Amino acid sequence: MKALYRYPQMEFPYEILLQDNKARSCQEPEFKLIDTGVLDDGKYWNIYVEYAKSRQNPKQLWCRYTIHNANQDESATLKLLPQFWFRKCINDKQDNENASQKPQSPHIMQINEDTAQVIYDLGNFSVSFDINNQRPTLLFTDNKDDPGGESGGFGCKDAFHRYLIWNDRAVVKSNKCGTKCGALFELRLSPGGSIEVYWVLSPEFSQMNLDLQAAKKIFDERLEEANDFYDKLFPISWANEQRNIARQAYAGLLWSKQFYSYDVKTWTKKKALRERKKSSVASVISGQRSALKSEEAGCIQQSTHVDSVVSSVNPAHIPLEEEMLVDKDEKNKEAGCSQQSTHVDSVVSSVNPAHTSLEEKILVEKDERNKDWKHIQNHDIILMPDKWEFPWYAIWDLAFHMIPLCRVDPDLAKQQLLLMLSDTYMHPSGQFPGCEFNFADPNPPLIPWACLDVYRKTGSSDTNFLKSCFHRLNFNFSWWINKKEDGSSGLFTGGFMGLDNISVLDRSATLPGYTLLQADASGWMAHFSLCMLEMCVILAQHDNVYDDLALFFINHFIRIAEAVNMCIEDGGLWHEVDHFYYDVLKSETSKRPICIRSLVGLIPVLAFSRIKGTDLVNVPSLRDKLQALKETYPSYVLFSDEGDVILTQVPADRQKHIVSCLKNADEFFSPFGIRSLSKFYYHNRYEFQLDKKRTLSLCYAPGESNTNMFGGNSNWRGPVWLCMNYLLMENLQARGQDFTILGSNMGDDTLSELAENIARNIISIFLPDENGRRPLHGSVSLYDLPDWKDLVLFYEYFHADTGRGCGASHQTGWTSLVIEFLFKCANKV
């Protein structure tokens, strides 16, 4: 594992970044570190971080930092502080005076100048440091919150920051023992100079002198093996540029692994305690103010004892890490005009948070996040969307992660999918968790597609894996049918569905008196049905019980396809004039289409499947059913000349209109992929009159969001998103065997060629253009320099008209799908 951390030698411009971005409007791009100038003129550090293991001792972990002074004119000093810590190891009873026994925390303890022992109930370790025989200064503290906030606190988790930045030597632990350890190196490098720093974590106590030559050999061997592995994986036809992009994409994907810990029941319990304390403090201070008002006039001096007030509320029953409960703004609000008096402290300290009023309990219950997800007990290593900016899992992001991952680590890909299907993640009702901000917000049901794809990409032999997935996915399918279908109409009301601001409406919100029938939710469910059907066909080769189950899913597919394809005035989602699928806002008296050409209306196209005729031999009930459906529903069930069955939600005549729109450069087709919203809305703002008082609107925004909807951090109103482009490319490729584009004015002859063009356009975002610049970097001239030109960032989404990267910049994550586009263009899919 290897990563580059590029850090300025000047003061990090926190305040400049904060103030400049606060001053910018929604019409302006984000002001980034690279825009501040602190990285100009080579005034930065290149810090390469590498991890490797020895074959002789695979439980021993080596790390090497290679630090380069990029400044060719001046020497510079860097303070390097590798850190090791245990997660908060504080038991809820640890600070209770009445607890009969205090649990012993694990700890790290210095044993000589460059080695520390690690004492832990899962095993004992040692960590040793070396830098050409230079000894570090070992620092120790505890990984616990500072109860004093900015006032300072001995032995707390921010002690190293205070030690380095504020030169406060008293905050670290002099006994050289704690739950957090740092090894401080002060490095002085000449212009253009470099140095290597090593440390090793060993699974036993050791006072070893590091053999740096042996360590270098370990890194050289692992690098050679990694190069051999990727050389065999990548097509011979790839040039160095393609290999460079793919290697960095895989590096980002593998670095996105993170230990994620969230126990909703425990979190909710602690939150309730916090709310009670806040409520108790507020009630007492409010009552005290009322009493003081009768004795004093005007504004009375602010109390300096609010911090102690908060921490004195029955502390015996509050975990240590929960002690500081009121932030500065809340303190100021509550203490704004109160008397400086020790009487306030004594009054508040007598409040018992257990005696909470009914109103307060109702308030806590009302504000309780994820209150219906108390079964969630997540303590696992999971691939994150972006470890820097989105350090929490999102269920449909993770489905995309598995596609490139299964090429390099198939076992991990299967494990991640089974994890999401387990009972500590999936709700007892069958719903998948969305993301931690609201587990109940539905994401597109793409886990079944990912399970099927991983099964096929890993050899199509692990039927036990597929069977395990199928039975758990059955619960999720039933949840969608029972909870999100509009009656028995075959249309669905998914809500959020991961596309943030793509509509004029906030699709996460509830509109009283209305139901939003969604083209994407309905399309996803048809797609879900076909994925389950394909699994049944595979599993029926070994167990005929799946033959009957297949009938269940084909019936649902036909029902949904028929409903979606009805004209809007007849209760469906197809607009006969615009030739597009739209969401429909339904009330008791009306059905009003939201006529926006976006990815929402393209998703029904994804519901497509081709089942080989030879596979139907062992599924006789399904084979007979399909023969009958061919006569009744010829638009959705077709047979090829080879005897294969083709299932499609979008009939051929409507597919022609959709593809025409998809291929049009003034609509969806951009030089860098398929847009999320038609460019038609650049000059034609769309307006939707919700009622007499509210008119909603949107327009084409090819880069960053031009509204604050969903926080303004993402944008589905024009930019190119690799996740949806991948699904469209894959679908067009599959359809290309049986359908051709009619009409020479549409350019390409087949859907397969259109898929290839999409892949090439996506790849062009990352490749240097005729001027040697990668479109994803925009106009940043630093990337013209030798030290920068080979670096690739994997942004969340991309400006549809320029290819410039937008949003989170380490989204590998689903932007690692560029690997699949590269394979597509190499004809190795």
Describe each model-derived feature in a short phrase.
Residues 294-370:
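Feature detects tandemly repeated or modular, low-complexity segments in exposed regions of proteins
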